[in-house]
């Protein structure tokens, strides 16, 4: 089974739309694809259960079906940094629990597991625990989502440098236009990303207000 981790250059970089696009792309390759959002804040109550909209969107794009708790083990209502939300809730985000949650999918009949992170790459989860430590242990290939906004060149370069320093493999990167208006000189910035980044550009996704109903796989490069 292939395991992919969708990381962002920062918060609101477009991770969810990119992750859903990647899931659609893999499904079109005739793969059985499972999804995870291991840690999520900004959750809401639905039928007596805390759920996260990003996780629900991922589940809608997947062609496999698993219980919500398998997809999103840690849920927090407050829309704040997960380690702070966890502390407020009297919860400690546990590395072993996260590793076991991922390992559970390894025992299922699936071809790929797509894991969406939270926040940026170096997300703190608990005292002495950051998301990259989990990503490395589950041997996931990282897909970096670059939100096309001012500062994205620096953020992309720093994120990729950090991913490699953590000993993780990079599957490629996806550019996402994050708002209705393109960033200043967007075409030139995208060209600069292509020049500066050695890793493969997987897709470039425009701003799509109704993206949950779109075929996002068309934005992947052949």
Curated annotation (Swiss-Prot):
The active site is at 37. Substrate binds at residue 41. It is an enzyme of class 6 (ligase). Its cofactor is Mg(2+). GO terms for molecular function: ATP binding; dethiobiotin synthase activity; magnesium ion binding. GO terms for biological process: biotin biosynthetic process. InterPro entries: DTB_synth_BioD, P-loop_NTPase. Keywords: ATP-binding, Biotin biosynthesis, Cytoplasm, Ligase, Magnesium, Metal-binding, Nucleotide-binding. Its EC number is 6.3.3.3. GO terms for cellular component: cytosol. It is found in: Cytoplasm. Homodimer. PANTHER family: DETHIOBIOTIN SYNTHETASE. Catalyzes a mechanistically unusual reaction, the ATP-dependent insertion of CO2 between the N7 and N8 nitrogen atoms of 7,8-diaminopelargonic acid (DAPA, also called 7,8-diammoniononanoate) to form a ureido ring. This is ATP-dependent dethiobiotin synthetase BioD. It comes from Idiomarina loihiensis (strain ATCC BAA-735 / DSM 15497 / L2-TR).
């Amino acid at each position: 089974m292939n395991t992919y981790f969708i990381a962002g250059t920062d918060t609101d970089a477009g991770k969810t739309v990119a992750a859903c696009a990647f899931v659609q792309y893999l499904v079109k390759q005739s793969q059985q694809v499972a999804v995870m959002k291991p840690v999520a804040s900004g959750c809401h109550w639905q039928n007596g259960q805390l759920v996260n909209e990003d996780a629900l969107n991922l589940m809608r794009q997947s062609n496999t079906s698993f219980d919500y708790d398998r997809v999103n083990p840690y849920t927090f209502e407050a829309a704040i940094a997960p380690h702070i939300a966890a502390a407020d809730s009297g919860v400690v985000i546990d590395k072993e629990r996260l590793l076991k949650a991922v390992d559970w999918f390894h025992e299922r009949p699936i071809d790929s597991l797509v894991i969406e992170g939270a926040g940026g790459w170096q997300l703190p989860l608990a005292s002495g625990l950051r998301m990259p430590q989990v990503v490395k242990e589950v041997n996931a290939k990282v897909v970096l989502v670059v939100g096309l906004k001012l500062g994205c060149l620096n953020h992309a370069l720093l994120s990729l440098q950090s991913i490699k320093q953590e000993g993780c493999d990079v599957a490629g990167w996806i550019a996402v236009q994050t708002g209705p208006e393109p960033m200043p000189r967007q075409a030139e910035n995208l060209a600069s990303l292509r020049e500066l980044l050695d890793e493969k550009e997987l897709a470039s996704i425009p701003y799509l207000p109704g993206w949950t109903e779109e075929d996002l796989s068309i934005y992947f490069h052949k």
